[in-house]
Amino acid sequence: MTRSPIPLEYPAMDARAALPAYSPQSIAPTSAAPTSAEAPVVALNGFARRFGDVTVIEGLDLTIQPGEFVALLGRSGSGKTTLLRTLAGLDSAEGQDVQVPAARAVVFQDARLLPWKKVWRNVALGLRGGDIRNRAQDALREVGLGHRLDAWPLTLSGGEAQRVALARALVREPSLLLLDEPFAALDALTRLRMHDLVLNLWRAHRCAVLMVTHDVDEAVALADRILVLDGGRIAAEERITIPRGQRAELTQPLRQKLLGILGGTDAAVDERVIRFPQASYPQAGSHHAAPLQVAGA
C-alpha cells in the first residue's frame, strides 16, 4: 500500500531560507500516550549488563507501550547506548528477561549510508518481495526526498542523509523505532526541521519510539515520557500529559529539574561571563596572546 507523503515540504537546505522562530507551539498537539492496559512493545525485567568487572546496567526494569514516544537522558557512560544496542539486537540478551518486537529499526547519529549504493538502494537494503524500488521511493517521498532517489550518498547534506536513514528505518514498518542521538551532528536549523519531521512520521506510522538524547529541551518537546538513566538504573521518570504545542510553561521548570538530576545547571554556558584581560594585549610582532579567562571555568 502506498502511503501518502508527510505534509511537510523540504527543499534543498539553505540556511538563508526564512524559518519561523522555534518554540514548543510550533509542534502540533497529538493524542495522549497509549494506556498501560495495552501489551507493551518492550519489556525488560531485572536487566543487567557487565563488561568484565564493570557493571554498566544493573537490575533495570523498563516497559514501553505501543505508539509511545520515550526519551532517554543520561550522562556519558550511564548505559544509554548499551541499552539501545541490546534493544536493537546488536548485543546479545541471552539468559535475561528481555522482550522486544521482531519488527524494529534503529537510526544512529551517523546515517551509516553505503556510499557505493544509490540512495534508493540504501533505503531498500534487506527488503524482500516485489516493487522494492517503488517502496523505497514511497519512503523517500515521506521524508521529502523523492527527488533524490538516484542520488549518491556523498552528494547529500547531513540533514538529507539522516532523512534517508529515517526512510530506511520506517520502510520496514517497525513496531519499535530506536533513535540514538540522530540529530546531534546537525546544525540548529536542520535539527528543528528534523524534530517536526520525526513527529509527523511518528504520527503517521504509530510505532513506539525510544530516543536517546543529551538535549533536555529536545526530550521535553518530543516525548510522552522522559527517563533519566544514571549508574545503570532509572534515576527519574517524567510523564508529560500536556499536549505538544502547549508545553511552553512546562519547559523551564522541567528543564531545571532534569538538569538537577543529571548533575548540571540550567544554561550553564550562558551564565558564565567571558572576561577579557585588561591592559594585557600583546605587542606588535608578539605571538603570545594573553589567555582568555572564563568565570566559573
What are these regions (language model features)?
Residues L166:
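Hydrophobic anchor residue at the start of the ABC signature
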Residues W152-L156, E160:
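Conserved ABC ATPase signature
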Residues V171-S175:
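A short, proline-enriched helix->beta-strand linker immediately N-terminal to the Walker B motif
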Residues A88:
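Helix-to-loop junction immediately C-terminal to a conserved catalytic motif
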Residues L73-R75:
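The feature captures the beta-strand-to-loop junction immediately N-terminal to the Walker
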Residues G231-K257:
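Conserved beta-strand-loop-alpha-helix hinge in the C-terminal portion
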Residues V42, I57-G59:
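Conserved structural motif at the start of ABC-family nucleotide-binding domains
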